[in-house]
């Protein structure tokens, strides 16, 4: 437990997509339906991260996303809300607005756009957010987007803060991740953000996985986690990791976010297209996505819309 009594994060957490209408507004019925379909197979729901397009959404749409998510989840799993922004003042303002929806955790990135290179300033940024936040804070290391990696030395200092309870690491740097794992404690959890490292991360002691794949294949990730947790034969876990790799090809179809939304569309979820300027998948890319989601060996792991027959529960 952290100093404020909050549990450290863990399990299979979904960084949720934001279904959008053609006008760029939240498609609330689709959002609520997708939440209800996925929550039974999740340990947490993370809205307004990279998969949720936070940095492109108008503030009022982001607030609606947080409000509807908390309302629809209704306490079934913890709700994580992303609040990363370009600087401290904007991050604090966003945190104030979005935590009011009733989130269980705030997920905070390093400030982006300007390159902050002083370690002390980075630490001060997160400490200021954690001091002010009414709920626990999870650090989010995603240097491919922020262009500012969180070094293990920075995370180690921040892990001592009583209101900072975990880290989502999406950098894909295994050597740094091993150092992050060494920082785990009763009050600080470490989660892997790259699904291709799921098995080795869980074997090495990671508290969970936060993967965009959980938007349509949470059962596959849960089975992989259970395989590690139950101590099943190594080959069984590796076979499940191999399935993860087969499914992950959808993220290679155009921009990864376009591939994610095209996959959900192929499964019957009308989540719309990515926010401009990211282009949607073209016809050829959509054909590859459809081939993947209709592969007999993969279909049982995928969560199709109720009116779709693209996936069948195992």
Where are these regions (language model features)?
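C-terminal alpha-helical cap/extension of soluble enzyme domains
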Residues: 4, 8-17, 34-42, 203-206, ...
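Secondary-structure boundary/capping signal
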Residues: 77-78, 137, 166, 188, ...
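Catalytic alpha/beta core domains of metabolic enzymes, predominantly
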Residues: 131, 143-252
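Short alpha-helix boundary/capping motifs
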Residues: 66, 97, 126-127, 158, ...
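Surface-exposed charge patches
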Residues: 96, 199, 262
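A general structural signal for well-ordered alpha-helical segments in protein cores
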Residues: 31, 62, 66, 91, ...
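Active-site beta->alpha loop and helix N-cap motifs at the rims of alpha/beta catalytic domains
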Residues: 2-149
């Amino acid at each position: 437990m952290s100093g404020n009594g909050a549990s450290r994060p863990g399990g299979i957490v979904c960084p949720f997509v934001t279904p959008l209408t053609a006008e760029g507004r939240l498609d609330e019925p689709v959002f609520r339906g997708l939440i209800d379909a996925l929550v039974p197979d999740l340990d947490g729901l993370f809205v307004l991260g990279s998969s949720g397009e936070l940095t492109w959404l108008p503030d009022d749409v982001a607030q609606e996303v947080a409000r509807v998510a908390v309302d629809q989840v209704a306490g079934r799993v913890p709700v994580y809300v992303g609040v990363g922004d370009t600087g401290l003042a904007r991050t604090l303002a966003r945190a104030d607005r979005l935590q009011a929806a009733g989130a269980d955790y705030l997920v905070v990135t390093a400030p982006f756009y300007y390159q902050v290179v002083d370690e002390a300033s980075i630490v001060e940024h997160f400490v200021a957010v954690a001091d002010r936040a009414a709920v626990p804070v999870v650090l989010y290391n995603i240097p491919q987007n922020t262009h500012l990696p969180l070094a293990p030395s920075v995370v180690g200092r921040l892990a001592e803060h009583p209101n900072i309870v975990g880290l989502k690491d999406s950098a894909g740097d295994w050597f740094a991740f091993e150092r992050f794992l060494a920082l785990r404690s009763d009050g600080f959890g470490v989660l892997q953000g790259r699904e291709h490292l799921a098995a080795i991360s869980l074997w090495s002691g990671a508290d969970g996985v936060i993967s965009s794949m959980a938007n349509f294949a949470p059962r596959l990730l849960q089975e992989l986690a259970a395989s590690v947790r139950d101590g099943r034969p190594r080959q069984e876990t590796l076979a499940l990791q191999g399935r993860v790799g087969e499914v992950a090809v959808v993220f290679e179809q155009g921009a990864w976010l376009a591939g994610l939304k095209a996959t959900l569309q192929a499964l019957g979820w009308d989540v719309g297209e990515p926010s401009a300027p990211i282009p949607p998948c073209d016809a050829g890319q959509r054909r590859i996505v459809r081939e993947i989601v209709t592969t007999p060996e993969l279909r049982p792991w995928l969560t199709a819309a109720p009116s779709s027959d693209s996936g069948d529960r195992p």
